[in-house]
Amino acid sequence: MAETPVTRRTTPRRTTLLGLTLLVIVLVGGVAVWTTTCPCNQTPGFMLLGDVQTTPVTDWSFVNDVPLCQIQVTAFGLPHSVNLNCMATPDGQLFLSCSGCERKFWGRHVKDNEQGRLRLNGRVYPVIFHRVTNEAVLDRAWAARVKKLQVYGGGPYNPVPSPDAKRPKEWSTFKLRSAI
């Protein structure tokens, strides 16, 4: 007696389950890549990973040796990270550049004396944010920014300013200090 071959039929339910499974795998993979590699250019990231430093930093001059910093703040209870200009003054104080800060998601969610994280070259530094309102301190931070951008500026989002550029009124800054 000859056996008749059994043919499997793909049901719509099976196809839907397979499609949903593949979608979940792609989404989980995408989130995994995003959380470990971003912030990227203008795309914000999640948690900053890296070698967390446990020694307090008092002289931040080394930030002037990297084009951009990555910061992590907390918004709605979740980590949110971005790339931005950071600069140190000649006396080693650390500042973040924030043009039009009130329009930026991260800038609206940083409270005074809030803890966050700063990542440079794979090292993560726990920091405390302080919004600067003193005009003299704003001018010192602006001068440090202009000086640093003479070396690292020039990209589409980070043009090189004139060496004697005046600080725009909508520009603000945060002073960071070590949280350790």
Language model segments and positions:
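Short beta-strand segments
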Residues: D65-C101, R119, I128-F129
